[in-house]
């Protein structure tokens, strides 16, 4: 999926997606822990 010479905006987009996914999982875990 990652090609050479890929635009920076695409890499930033993937990074943002990964961050938001991890953040969502953290909220779910913390929510179930009662914090």
Swiss-Prot record:
Q: How does it sit in the membrane?
A: Single-pass membrane protein
Supply the alphabetized keyword list.
Answer: Chloroplast, Electron transport, Membrane, Photosynthesis, Plastid, Thylakoid, Transmembrane, Transmembrane helix, Transport
Q: Which GO terms describe its cellular component?
A: chloroplast thylakoid membrane; cytochrome b6f complex
Please indicate which superkingdom the organism of origin belongs to: Eukaryota
- Per the UniProt record, one Pfam family is PetN
Q: Which SUPFAM superfamilies match?
A: PetN subunit of the cytochrome b6f complex
Residue ranges that the Swiss-Prot or TrEMBL entry lists as coiled coil = none
Where it sits in the cell: the answer is: Plastid, Chloroplast thylakoid membrane
**Transmembrane segments in this chain: where?**
10-32
Q: Which GO terms describe its molecular function?
A: electron transporter, transferring electrons within cytochrome b6/f complex of photosystem II activity
Gene Ontology BP annotations:
cytochrome complex assembly; photosynthesis
Q: Which InterPro entries match?
A: Cytochr_b6-f_cplx_su8_sf, Cytochrome_b6-f_cplx_su8
Keyword Plastid applies: yes
* Entries under HAMAP family matching the protein: Cytb6_f_PetN (MF_00395)
Instruction: Name the family.
Output: Belongs to the PetN family.
Q: What else is known?
A: Unlike its orthologs this protein is not encoded in the chloroplast.
Q: How is the quaternary structure described?
A: The 4 large subunits of the cytochrome b6-f complex are cytochrome b6, subunit IV (17 kDa polypeptide, PetD), cytochrome f and the Rieske protein, while the 4 small subunits are PetG, PetL, PetM and PetN. The complex functions as a dimer.
Briefly state the protein's biological role: Component of the cytochrome b6-f complex, which mediates electron transfer between photosystem II (PSII) and photosystem I (PSI), cyclic electron flow around PSI, and state transitions.
- Name of the featured protein: Cytochrome b6-f complex subunit 8, chloroplastic
Lineage runs:
Eukaryota, Viridiplantae, Chlorophyta, core chlorophytes, Chlorophyceae
């Amino acid at each position: 999926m990652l090609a050479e010479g890929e635009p920076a905006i695409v890499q930033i987009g993937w990074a943002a997606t990964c961050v938001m996914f991890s953040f969502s999982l953290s909220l779910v875990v913390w929510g179930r822990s009662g914090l």
